[in-house]
Amino acid sequence: MGDGWLPPDCGPHNRSGGGGATAAPTGSRQVSAELLSQQWEAGMSLLMALVVLLIVAGNVLVIAAIGRTQRLQTLTNLFITSLACADLVMGLLVVPFGATLVVRGTWLWGSFLCECWTSLDVLCVTASIETLCVIAIDRYLAITSPFRYQSLMTRARAKVIICTVWAISALVSFLPIMMHWWRDEDPQALKCYQDPGCCDFVTNRAYAIASSIISFYIPLLIMIFVYLRVYREAKEQIRKIDRCEGRFYGSQEQPQPPPLPQHQPILGNGRASKRKTSRVMAMREHKALKTLGIIMGVFTLCWLPFFLVNIVNVFNRDLVPDWLFVFFNWLGYANSAFNPIIYCRSPDFRKAFKRLLCFPRKADRRLHAGGQPAPLPGGFISTLGSPEHSPGGTWSDCNGGTRGGSESSLEERHSKTSRSESKMEREKNILATTRFYCTFLGNGDKAVFCTVLRIVKLFEDATCTCPHTHKLKMKWRFKQHQA
């Protein structure tokens, strides 16, 4: 979707003015122009190389993390993988050639490769944007119908959806471009088509409007509608839980036999717990809004300007300067670098990234010495971050983990004890909230429990089938620690 952009003519023009002003020598003007042109090329090359590096590194990391971490191989992450593949192809085969076209100001590889490059550009852009739309619909179904989602969205259906997205993208890109359905009859456009050094994507009105609607405007409208519904559903479910929670803590204030001292901190004072949980609900609502705002804000900021000028350009080619069109096009390319950051913000992804970047074998040995389960043959623990593990010895950073046996120092033991106590304090709050969900919500309202989990972890699957089991496991862990 890119146009060529010639470097600016930096040399001064010859002028003859009154008053006997003399022009600078021609040789000095040429040297100055060449020097400025070289500086411009060096600066643009460095900037575009940075964009390519960010796109490739980020998406390779996402694909490797999902492929090598069993915990991340979920249905939603199938769509994330498809998105990362589209962005990776963009970073490897589209953006570098576009950077060469911008820096050199001419196409170096002939007309046929120009059409192939343009087709690949449109293919990756369309696949990336439509996959973002599919992810939005997937999260909408998971949040609004959590139990129905389990049977509605299977792995086979997810693969069919991904293949459909790529097929639609190919129909919008390769078919019309290679068949020359996109070409215009404008004399300036015809001159570009006949020049092997020109690779400007000058299209007719029908193709520009149709491709923009299919590739961007329809997905944009769907994403706006879906994410508005997701946020409204989030607020409604949080209010519903808050109302039920009031009844729950009201019942806790009735006279009860005094508990044993060591069991007293589990639920604490009813009113204080209610205020604390209300604050937690407000924080979750804020986090959901923040996540949705980041998703829609970055996507719209990156692609809306380009697709607006893409429509305007076919009606009046002189209205939008070439440099502005190219800038908006590269702003859209930058979205491929932002996607891994936005859609892989979960703790599971961050842990997988750390394992990939920080010598995983060494990290596995430290985890094993710290009391974690033995790693699988692939070198990764299948239940990374699972609540069933013992409280101590969690892997938190690249240099984390503790050394067992007689080599452990007193300071390390104290540090491990502090981490365990801090984790147990968090589990007390989780236990109280989970007990409330499982005991005081009826069968129909258990979906609320799953909904809140999916709202807070918007792009992770949450276990929704047996919250009672989760409660019992955490309760058993607490009693084991107290013993």
Curated annotation (Swiss-Prot):
Residues holding cyanopindolol: 121, 211, 329
Region spans: Disordered: 1-26, 250-270, 387-425
SUPFAM superfamilies in the cross-refs: Family A G protein-coupled receptor-like
Lipid addition sites, S-palmitoyl cysteine: 358
GO cellular component terms, semicolon-separated: early endosome; membrane; plasma membrane
Glycan-bearing residues: 14
Record carries keyword Glycoprotein: yes
Domain of life: Eukaryota
Keywords recorded for this protein, A-Z: Cell membrane, Disulfide bond, Endosome, G-protein coupled receptor, Glycoprotein, Lipoprotein, Membrane, Palmitate, Phosphoprotein, Receptor, Transducer, Transmembrane, Transmembrane helix
GO biological process: adenylate cyclase-activating adrenergic receptor signaling pathway; norepinephrine-epinephrine-mediated vasodilation involved in regulation of systemic arterial blood pressure; positive regulation of heart contraction; positive regulation of MAPK cascade; regulation of circadian sleep/wake cycle, sleep
Basic and acidic residues bias: start-end ranges: 410-425
MF annotations from Gene Ontology: beta1-adrenergic receptor activity; identical protein binding
Entry's localization field: Cell membrane; Early endosome
Extracellular topological domain residue ranges: 1-38, 104-115, 180-205, 316-320
Segments on the Cytoplasmic side according to the record's topology features: 68-76, 138-155, 232-285, 344-483
Membrane topology: Multi-pass membrane protein
Sequence similarity: Belongs to the G-protein coupled receptor 1 family. Adrenergic receptor subfamily. ADRB1 sub-subfamily.
Function as written in the Swiss-Prot or TrEMBL entry: Beta-adrenergic receptors mediate the catecholamine-induced activation of adenylate cyclase through the action of G proteins. This receptor binds epinephrine and norepinephrine with approximately equal affinity. In dorsal pons neurons, involved in the regulation of sleep/wake behaviors.
Protein name: Beta-1 adrenergic receptor
Species the sequence originates in: Meleagris gallopavo
Classification of source organism: Eukaryota, Metazoa, Chordata, Craniata, Vertebrata
This protein's encoding gene: ADRB1
